[in-house]
UniProtKB/Swiss-Prot annotation:
Gene giving rise to this polypeptide: murB
Keyword Hydrolase: no
GO cellular component, one term: cytosol
Protein name: UDP-N-acetylenolpyruvoylglucosamine reductase
Job description of the protein: Cell wall formation.
Family, as annotated: Belongs to the MurB family.
Catalytic activity: UDP-N-acetyl-alpha-D-muramate + NADP(+) = UDP-N-acetyl-3-O-(1-carboxyvinyl)-alpha-D-glucosamine + NADPH + H(+)
UniProt record, GO biological process: cell division; cell wall organization; peptidoglycan biosynthetic process; regulation of cell shape
Compartments reported by the entry: Cytoplasm
Positions of the FAD-binding PCMH-type domain: 31-213
Coiled coil: none
SUPFAM superfamilies tied to this protein: FAD-binding/transporter-associated domain-like, Uridine diphospho-N-Acetylenolpyruvylglucosamine reductase, MurB, C-terminal domain
Cited Pfam families: FAD_binding_4, MurB_C
Length: 302
């Protein structure tokens, strides 16, 4: 399908603009990445369903992203359609304390809503800059808690645009992974299992976890969080530091002096700069410890 026809068909299915040759650096927390042929932001689960079904039926390459907080987009960008869930962002908290959130809701915003009604459980996850959908897909975690620990149910859309429901124990959660990483299912909504708590205590914990994050992570620079998964029994940052990779630079990219498992964009970094540092870190850690560091961030595009 040619680009003009594809744009026309996308425009029929969503109520927001279809952005053409959209720089993905504007849609990732690393502020890195070339253009997508098209970027769209469906306004509802129904629009997302129509789009996914259409793209699948017409064999159009596409990718669904949330807040872009765990992604490295390569410098030539993405051929196809990027679907951003930012506007699929309703939160519902029932009188009985059930908490429902759509895929595009950011975790800090969800934690703030839970705090308002005195529900506890999201405090450890409150500073993760990801969306509900992205966090569930990769089983995001912080301070010893993972999102699976507070999840009750997940709803997804499959390639045919059909809604499916999974209980948390059916999601195949592992360290920084779930079945949704492998399967053609896209998370659209989740129900969380939270407990009533004292608002002052919840707020105190939220502040503590935010302060810890500020103290230990280089948040003054664009970044994508932890670049590598932790090998069993030892944090990746420790291996990186001891292998002598902390402080390495390439172009505008640098291995953070504050947290060795972060690569920061000090200004004008390219994806090629980041890839160079990733390879260098893996090489140095392997040479010193015979440990292969695996990526936590996902690489997208060409």
């Amino acid at each position: 399908m040619d680009k003009a026809k594809l744009k026309e068909e996308l425009t029929k299915r969503i109520s927001s603009p279809v952005l053409e040759n959209e720089p993905l650096a504007q849609h990732t927390t690393w502020k890195i990445g070339g253009p997508a042929d098209f970027l769209i932001e469906p306004q509802s689960i129904e629009e997302l369903s129509l789009v996914i079904r259409f793209l699948t039926e017409n064999a159009v390459n596409f990718r669904v992203i949330g807040n872009g907080s765990n992604i490295l987009v390569l410098d030539r960008g993405f051929r196809g359609v990027i679907i951003k869930t930012k506007k699929i962002n309703k939160v519902e908290i029932t009188a009985g304390g059930q908490v429902f959130a759509e895929a595009g809701v950011l975790l800090p915003a969800l934690a703030a809503r839970a705090l308002k009604v005195g529900l506890s459980g999201l405090e450890e996850l409150c500073a993760i800059p990801g969306s509900v959908g992205g966090a569930i897909r990769q089983n995001a975690g912080a301070h010893g808690k993972e999102i699976k620990d507070v999840l009750k149910r997940v709803w997804t859309i499959n390639e045919r645009g059909e809604l499916k429901e999974f209980f948390a124990n059916e999601c195949g959660f592992k360290y920084r992974s779930s079945r949704f990483k492998e399967e053609k299912q896209w998370i659209v909504k989740a129900e969380f299992s939270l407990n009533p708590g004292d608002k002052k205590e919840i707020l105190k914990k939220i502040r503590e976890f935010r302060e810890k994050r500020l103290a230990s992570q280089p948040l003054e620079f664009p970044n994508a969080g932890s670049v590598f998964k932790n090998p069993e029994g030892i944090p990746a940052w420790k291996l990186i530091k001891e292998a002598g990779a902390q402080g390495l630079k390439k172009g505008g990219a640098m291995v953070s002096e504050k947290h060795a498992n972060f690569i920061i964009n000090t200004g004008g970094a390219s994806a090629a700069d980041v890839i160079y540092l990733i390879n260098k870190i893996q090489e140095l850690v392997w040479k010193k410890f015979s440990v292969k560091l695996l990526l936590e961030v996902e690489v997208l595009g060409e």
